[in-house]
Amino acid sequence: GRGSNMRSLVEHQLPVRAVVSNRAEAAGLAFARDRGIPALALDHRAYSSRESFDQALTELIDRYHPEAVILAGFMRILSVGFVRHYEGRLINIHPSLLPAFAGLDTHARALKAGVKVHGATVHFVTPDLDAGPIIVQAAVPVRPDDSEATLAARVLAQEHRIFPLAVQWLLGGQLRIDKGVVHVAGNPPQWMFNAS
């Protein structure tokens, strides 16, 4: 992606040990390098299978001994082996109120469906696409005059609010999953609504 969610994590002073992308031209890599954060590209096209790429990706990530692996604009479906390796430490941000509009083109699909509320979700990653336990969500109204671009901009602003929060909870050991439901120590709100 554009790297804006990763930038949001850095700007919230969360510890980022490395930034990895499968695209050498990813904007987030340059941002990380400019701040002295190791920034690495691993081209998935150099590998014969998803599993072989994910194995190389795992080996690269593990060199940094991460407490968590945070997916921000990483647009590849990960293998079961990769997901299991980081189970409970692997989270993603998705531009919809899951379980609605999993996958791609969320804003266009939301507008076409005529939903009145749209938003973003931070969730644990499981082998099933965009189906992991939900950590936090933020909602925005869908306006009658919204385009994909205007809706996406409002959702992205909410992503920048909830993603650092979820990462902070994860790194602080505040998250617990019970029967597929995420609980946060201290019971802070796990949702936000911005009426504007």
Where are these regions (language model features)?
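N-terminal Rossmann-like dinucleotide-binding module
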Residues: R2-F31
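Short, basic/aromatic-enriched C-terminal tail that caps enzymatic domains
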Residues: R7, K179-S196
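Donor/substrate-binding cores of folate-linked one-carbon enzymes
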Residues: H12, N22, A68, A72-A185
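Conserved beta-strand segments of alpha/beta enzyme cores
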Residues: P15-A18, P38-L40, R89
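Short, structured coil segments at secondary-structure junctions
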Residues: R35-G36, Y86
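Short beta->alpha connector loops at strand-helix junctions that form conserved
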Residues: L40-R45, I93
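Glycine-rich, highly charged phosphate/nucleotide-binding loops
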Residues: R45-E59
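Glycine-rich phosphate-binding loop signature in dinucleotide/nucleotide-binding domains
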Residues: L60-P66
